[in-house]
A protein has these predicted regions:
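Bacterial Sec-dependent N-terminal signal peptides
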Residues: 1-29, 251
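TPR repeat positional signature
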Residues: 23, 61, 68, 136, ...
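Residue at a conserved register position within TPR or TPR-like alpha-solenoid repeats
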Residues: 30, 68, 143, 150, ...
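Post-signal peptide N-terminal segment of secreted/secretory-pathway proteins
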Residues: 32-154, 160
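Alpha-helical repeat scaffolds
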Residues: 41-45, 80-101, 159-167, 207-218, ...
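Structural signature of alpha-solenoid helical repeat scaffolds
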Residues: 52, 127-128, 185, 205, ...
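Short coil turns that delineate tetratricopeptide repeat
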Residues: 53-55, 109, 174, 221-223, ...
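Alpha-solenoid helical repeat scaffolds
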Residues: 58-63, 180-199, 225-233, 259-267
Length: 274
């Protein structure tokens, strides 16, 4: 009896696994179709992304990214044909695609049972992500501007979205997928995006995000001094006096003409009789 029950359990597990793998294949087929039903494709792949049988497969996340890429391409095709199109959908698809491809690459880098890494996704996915970086910037600017027209929770919600776009742009530069590109050195736009990420985070008082992204902007000739302001403010808000004072001193050395650092350091010494 136990053997029969065990066999039934195995059959059920196998059927569930097959069903989810079928969802992944069907979602991919829909996305690659002539008139794709993206809502259906997303419904199928979202099930696979959370199912224990398929959520750890690189292919699942690759298909999720493909759906977003195809959805963005469809909107751009409509724009080219002068048909109604959804600009925000293009931006959101670019953002989601990047995140899905990041996860795909992470899983594909796990060595197989022989200890070998066979990542068949990196080359094409990294090229696609690089091509979509402009839409991450545009999406961030769009939501940042929307936030400036609102107040309270509504503004915070849009600033959070803006930060997500800007942060993902920066995350590309530090992702192992793009190690050969050396984007931290070659991407001249990145410091500006890091500044905007810090600015969006500052508006929400999201100090951990400031401390994560502002350093990528602190050496920039145009916005570096403001990025260091954000860093100092975040360190003070988090109660790290030692690092806060160190950041003020570093700011004075890097940007002696910028009064923020010297003024706050003098105030600290005056208030503490030093």
């Amino acid at each position: 009896m136990k053997r029969v029950l065990f066999s039934m359990v195995l059959l059920l597990v196998a059927s569930f696994t097959f069903a989810q793998e079928k969802n992944v294949k069907e979602a991919k087929s829909i996305a690659n179709g002539v008139n794709p039903d993206f809502a259906k494709a997303e419904e199928l792949i979202n099930q696979a992304l959370t199912n224990p049988e398929t959520k750890d497969n690189a292919e699942t996340w690759d298909v999720a990214g493909l759906i977003q890429r195809k959805r963005s391409e469809k909107e751009m095709e409509n724009a080219y044909l002068r048909k109604p199109y959804d600009t925000l959908q293009v931006y959101n698809s670019a953002l989601n695609m990047c995140k899905f491809y990041f996860k795909c690459d992470e899983l594909a880098q796990i060595p197989n049972e022989k200890g070998k890494i066979k990542n068949k996704y990196r080359k094409s996915n990294s090229a696609t992500i690089l091509a979509e970086r402009g839409n991450l910037i545009n999406g961030g600017i769009q939501f940042f501007n929307l936030a400036s027209q609102k107040e309270g929770d509504a503004a915070n919600e849009d600033n959070k979205k803006a930060l997500d776009f800007f942060a993902t742009y920066i995350d590309i530069a530090i992702n192992p997928m793009f190690e050969k590109e050396n984007l931290l050195q070659t991407d001249t736009v990145l410091p500006q995006i890091a500044y905007y990420a810090s600015l969006a985070a500052a508006k929400m008082e999201d100090y951990p995000s400031i401390l994560k992204y502002a350093p990528y902007a602190q050496d920039d000739k145009e916005v570096g001094k403001y990025a260091m302001e954000f860093i100092s403010t975040a360190l003070k808000a988090e109660g790290d006096t030692v690092k806060w004072i160190a950041s003020l001193k570093e700011g004075i050395q890097k940007y002696p003409e910028h009064s923020f650092f010297f003024g706050h350091l003098i105030d600290y010494y005056s208030n503490n009789n030093k």
